[in-house]
Amino acid sequence: MKRIPSIRERNIVLIGFMGVGKTSVGEQLAKRLFRDFIDVDQEIEKTWKMKISDIFRLKGEEAFRKIEREMTIDYCTNTSLKVISLGGGAYMQDAIRTACLDHCIVIYLDLSWSLWKERLNVLIDNRPVLQDKKVEEMEQLFTKRQPTYQKNSFQVETDGREVAEIVSYLEEVIKLGWEIYGS
């Protein structure tokens, strides 16, 4: 039987809508906690040797979600001491959500719709889920995903906070959790 990692060894998984800063926060948090950082979307791009948008276009969303699910579950169940950034839609998959909750510490980076919308111009080209969508449709997707992100995760409001501030806060909270809940 496989040993369940201690609270200190568990991977830390960052979830939230696309473009909220999971990769930026994750990279810095991993450095602060002396862990490896994994961006699942980047790992998928390396594996398939193409951009996510090209995978969606050439292989379809279903093929993308399948490899996303396989990789994420593998990272969650077979590794430890990592900070893992999930793509915005990954946590919507039941199998991924279960693996994250069973084996990792899940942190939801929350950004308000109004501030997210301000980032739209820099996001739209690299986010296939947003292609050909009206702003109203994007808002519906944003709103639809919120309850799933919020359920069973530690929520961090990111509005008006710089990455360094978010990382410092998370480092403090995580280390406090380690102290309270033991090794």
From Swiss-Prot:
GO aspect biological process, one term: chorismate biosynthetic process
Residues annotated for substrate binding in this entry: D41, R65, G88, R145
Recorded GO CC terms: cytosol
SUPFAM superfamilies the record matches: P-loop containing nucleoside triphosphate hydrolases
UniProt KW keywords: Amino-acid biosynthesis, Aromatic amino acid biosynthesis, ATP-binding, Cytoplasm, Kinase, Magnesium, Metal-binding, Nucleotide-binding, Transferase
Compartments where located: Cytoplasm
Pfam families: SKI (PF01202)
Cofactors: Mg(2+)
Keyword Ligase on entry: no
HAMAP family assigned to the protein according to its UniProt record, in alphabetical order: Shikimate_kinase (MF_00109)
Protein name (record): Shikimate kinase
Organism name: Halalkalibacterium halodurans (strain ATCC BAA-125 / DSM 18197 / FERM 7344 / JCM 9153 / C-125)
GN (gene name): aroK
